[in-house]
Amino acid sequence: MKNKITFISAALLSITSTFFLNSCKKNDNSTVATESIEDNANAETHFDMIFDEVDDAAVSGGVYSRGKTAVITIDTLASPRTMTINYGDSNMSCADGNLRRGKIVVTWTGRYRAIGTIITVTPVNFFQNDFKIEGTKTIENKGRNSAGNLEWTIGVTNGKVTTPTGEIHTWSSNRTRTWVNGESTRFILLDDKYFITGTSTGTNR
């Protein structure tokens, strides 16, 4: 059964924390709600993992450290700039322990990570651990907010995850991520904390 669900979130995210979402009331829809939350979290995680690959490749200038033999092509003359990460047609065992195949196409409108730059990430016939990932993720660097914290807007449109058994989950999301702790210790990740607000909507399995 497909069920549409909308999430409105406001959360403090720490990389040392684990989150559990619990319904306030137990009812006949509890199983559906649980599946929807799990599917949404799974979809967001897949795109976060994809962006980790993108970020590593872009920051290193194409000297790829996560994959073994992924072919990276960066066109700095194009407008916007374009990067393609090609894992090939067969599963590649990457350094982070995940299997990937297909391509990730990335564009960015200005200097990577600069204020105002918009990064767009699109998987093309892309599979991660045999889950097919579709859709487009857009990240805009908004600079510092009134409190002096770095802020980004992050959106996913036409997101779709197809499981190895053929189950499909679709979603779209719009979020704002604010870096509230850990900026001064760039190389110490354990103290990083982000405040995330926004909405997400989609259909579960």
Regions found by a protein language model. Give the residues of each.
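Residue-level detector of intrinsically disordered, flexible termini
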Residues: 9-10, 42
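Short, Lys/Arg-rich N-terminal segment immediately upstream of the first membrane anchor
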Residues: 1-2, 25
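Bacterial N-terminal signal peptides that target proteins for export
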Residues: 2-9
